């Protein structure tokens, strides 16, 4: 009795691990920034700079960047912003990791707390979780039919599978100029911003993958007037890559 098999290529995780980083640091307000009176909004994100791979472990370098929107202290209260970065140097142990393996890393800021020590110093507390895993390409032999036996009952079931055509990483850098709508004041200083890709559509074409979507831009800015008026601009622009 012989099995007729078909080889399927698949990506599997050889090993994975989770590492949690705790931050509890003091941060001095830069000299160019006004004194902090009252905090309005905060956010943070992680930047992965470099990953050094050795036997059984990966050393991750990067930083936790935090942003703060606040009201300045003093007689003339203004809406201001500041940004800071705390370094990341974390070693993650991964069983079976070798020099030629590909390590994938995702991050999550589980908690970010900024508290006011005084008008020129902030306390920064945060918890960052790093998820790391090793991907490898392996072959799976799937039996398709049996030959050589006539008295063997066979039950068949159809499954839809996808084939890995190519695996690569590419970085899309979008650089566009957005015009402030008429009726809005001129921009003097950007205080807060958010970017979000919406309605992303990926399509396979001859020799390439096409992506289309919308880039949502939120911008909170000051016009530089003495009253420090705040205005919001929310244009949406289409993007297309291949």
Task: Label the model's feature ranges.
Residues 1-39:
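N-terminal alpha-helical "arm" segments
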Residues 14-17, 33-40, 50-61, 115-122, ...:
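Short, solvent-exposed beta-strand/turn "edge" segments of beta-rich domains on protein surfaces
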Residues 23, 29-41, 99-105, 180-195:
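Intrinsic, low-complexity N-terminal interaction/targeting segments
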Residues 104-149:
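Hydrophobic, ordered structural segments
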Residues 137-170:
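Surface-exposed beta-loop interaction hotspot
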Residues 160-196:
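Edge strands and adjacent loops of beta-rich recognition modules
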Residues 230-242:
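Single conserved hydrophobic/aromatic residue that forms the stacking wall/gate
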